[in-house]
Amino acid sequence: MITKTGTTIVGMKYKTGVILAADTRSTQGPVVSDKNCVKIHQITDKIMCCGAGTAADASRVARMASRELRLFQNKYLRLPLVSHFRKVCTQHLHKYGGGIGAALIVGGIDSEGCHLYEIHPHGSENSALFVSLGSGSLGAIATLESRYRAMDKDEAIDLACDAVKAGILNDLYSGSNIDVCVIDYSGVEFLRNYRRIGVSENTDTLVYPLDSVRIKREEVFDIVEEY
């Protein structure tokens, strides 16, 4: 059975960079196949992407585009732009007319500034201040639209996590933990399992007093025959 990431992935710009966040659940039909998979992929030193849809398709497209950008960098001795990654992915996906189940959120920083794009499986793309894709994107985008504003790094991380959490709590195919990636001019910071969702807050074991169940009557049955 095909493994799908189900997924709630989020991307947003903040004052000095870009935040990407994703849940960590992948499914095979109604079964959770992996509770802690990685949906955030590194493309170059300052370009990252999140993948939703079919797990194999999303990771293969990201790896293919990463190879293209690294070949460009080695050939021309120039750092590739985020728009270069966007172009490689959209042209590749458009050739297959939506047959490749990969929806991507791309974030990065280059010589032209901070960039955030959403790329759909049929090859269309859009630039945005914030975006969410995947089966849990409805809850996530509602959180982003109601609370997004000019923010610093810590505020942006909290909002991105809350958006993914909203997707997780309203989507059976999203769950487990939240991974966060911060991209700014100093580099990339990947925060693995930054927040756990759905874990019981009360971890104390229940202890019952010995006299909590009182014996009101005692009766002995002789069921062994004596010879």
Curated annotation (Swiss-Prot):
Taxonomic superkingdom: Eukaryota
Catalyzed reaction equations: Cleavage of peptide bonds with very broad specificity
Residues spanning the signal sequence: none
InterPro entries on file: Ntn_hydrolases_N, Proteasome_bsu_CS, Proteasome_sua/b, Proteasome_suB-type
Single Gene Ontology MF annotation: threonine-type endopeptidase activity
GO biological process terms on file: proteolysis involved in protein catabolic process
SUPFAM superfamilies associated with the record: N-terminal nucleophile aminohydrolases (Ntn hydrolases) (SSF56235)
Gene3D superfamilies: Glutamine Phosphoribosylpyrophosphate, subunit 1, domain 1 (3.60.20.10)
EC number, UniProt record: 3.4.25.1
Catalytic center residues: 7
Propeptide span(s): 1-6
Subunit relationships: The 26S proteasome consists of a 20S proteasome core and two 19S regulatory subunits. The 20S proteasome core is composed of 28 subunits that are arranged in four stacked rings, resulting in a barrel-shaped structure. The two end rings are each formed by seven alpha subunits, and the two central rings are each formed by seven beta subunits. The catalytic chamber with the active sites is on the inside of the barrel.
PANTHER family on file: METALLOPROTEASE TLDD (PTHR32194), PROTEASOME SUBUNIT BETA TYPE-7 (PTHR32194:SF4)
Physiological role: The proteasome degrades poly-ubiquitinated proteins in the cytoplasm and in the nucleus. It is essential for the regulated turnover of proteins and for the removal of misfolded proteins. The proteasome is a multicatalytic proteinase complex that is characterized by its ability to cleave peptides with Arg, Phe, Tyr, Leu, and Glu adjacent to the leaving group at neutral or slightly basic pH. It has an ATP-dependent proteolytic activity.
Name of this protein: Probable proteasome subunit beta type-2
Recorded name of the encoding gene: PUP1
